[in-house]
A protein has these predicted regions:
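Pyridoxal 5′-phosphate
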Residues: 1-174
Length: 174
């Protein structure tokens, strides 16, 4: 909800961060280049607005998640929610016995944008190494999608996605 190309990094005390881009001495020698002042200002405003309503926003996103999962359950769609401690509104969810890439393509044809695997592995057809390293077996990792909801979504949107996803899974399993 803020400008692209800008962000913040919280570094836990005691963590030794190494630079990955060499150059000038800006940002404590961690990232070279002139700071994007307008991006920083926009990011600050976005954070301020998000924090003003953080509890309401989190509750809204959790309600959307619950609506989505409830609809999958009503449709008797087997699923595995991978990450318990996560950002509200972002589901990493596996559908055993279903190919995640096929799901992604079929959903895309319906105008529904999701991602395959984890954020670290988007753009690849291989099982996400992050999911594998967290103990998820390869077959389940290959059936995993990342689905995100935001404040622009309504309950009807989430129900539509769950219904279309259910229809696609049932069709693929025939």
């Amino acid at each position: 909800y803020g400008p692209k190309g800008i962000g913040a990094l919280f570094i836990r005390k005691g963590v030794d961060l190494k630079t990955i881009i060499n150059g000038g001495g800006q940002e404590l020698n961690l990232r070279p280049g002139t700071e994007n002042i307008s991006g920083i200002a926009g990011f600050g405003l976005a954070i301020s607005k998000a924090c003003n309503n953080i509890n309401n926003n989190m509750l809204y996103l959790k309600n959307l998640e619950n609506t989505f999962i409830k609809k999958l359950n009503q449709n008797k769609i087997e699923h595995v929610l991978h990450i318990k401690d996560r950002l509200p509104g972002v589901l990493t969810i596996g559908f055993p016995g279903t190919d995640g890439q096929s799901l992604l393509i079929a959903l895309d044809l319906k105008g529904i944008a999701v991602s395959f695997g984890s954020a670290c592995s988007s753009g690849t057809t291989k099982a996400s190494q992050i999911l594998l390293d967290s103990g998820i077996n390869k077959d389940l990792a290959k059936s995993t999608l990342r689905i995100s909801f935001g404040k622009i979504h309504k309950s009807e949107d989430v129900e539509y996605v769950a219904e279309e996803l259910s229809n696609i899974i049932n069709r693929l399993k025939k």
